[in-house]
Amino acid sequence: MANHNQENSQQSDMAEKLIAVNRVSKVVKGGRIFSFTALTVVGDGNGRVGFGYGKAREVPAAIQKAMEKAHRNIVTIDLKGTTLQHVITGKHSGSKVFMKPASEGTGIIAGGAMRAVLEVAGVQNVLSKAYGSTNPINVVRATVSALVNMHSPEGMAAKRGKRVDEILG
């Protein structure tokens, strides 16, 4: 019971953002059946981020399902203060994203779905660009995969059995 309350308190301090709501239809013999999809991201602003995609007959139910999935799919990323460790790229389906660390005071230079992911993850200074498909679902997946594949120099040095200054050159 105490563990469940601890999970609820952790979820309550997460920032939640709704990225997209879409009406979709299923065509049946009697006509069309409409339902709604929602894409959301959650994060603690300190390197933890997750996204969720929910579908239901009503908008609030779709958003609720998406938020629950986002809370279940949280990943941790290695940030360097308020920016990224190094230049990263990510790809999912037809979407490609490019992100580059920026100096203090630059802000989040990103569009649409990528901006929402970076904001809730706690990245405050970044230069980024989305190429190819700008479908929000694919852009979010590409952004999260790029962030997950980013590693700190300390982590890479430990993996390779070298010192940090050897890694950085």
Curated annotation (Swiss-Prot):
One of its GO terms (molecular function) is structural constituent of ribosome. Residues 14-77 form the S5 DRBM domain. Keywords: Ribonucleoprotein, Ribosomal protein, RNA-binding, rRNA-binding. InterPro entries: Ribosomal_Su5_D2-typ_SF (IPR020568), Ribosomal_uS5 (IPR000851), Ribosomal_uS5_bac-type (IPR005712), Ribosomal_uS5_C (IPR005324), Ribosomal_uS5_N (IPR013810), Ribosomal_uS5_N_CS (IPR018192), Ribsml_uS5_D2-typ_fold_subgr (IPR014721). The keyword Ribonucleoprotein applies. SUPFAM superfamilies: dsRNA-binding domain-like, Ribosomal protein S5 domain 2-like. GO terms for cellular component: small ribosomal subunit. The keyword Methyltransferase does not apply. Disulfide bonds: none annotated. GO terms for biological process: translation. Signal peptide: none annotated. It comes from the Bacteria. HAMAP family: Ribosomal_uS5_B. Part of the 30S ribosomal subunit. Contacts proteins S4 and S8. The N-terminal domain interacts with the head of the 30S subunit; the C-terminal domain interacts with the body and contacts protein S4. The interaction surface between S4 and S5 is involved in control of translational fidelity. With S4 and S12 plays an important role in translational accuracy. Belongs to the universal ribosomal protein uS5 family. This is Small ribosomal subunit protein uS5. It comes from Colwellia psychrerythraea (strain 34H / ATCC BAA-681) (Vibrio psychroerythus). The gene is rpsE.
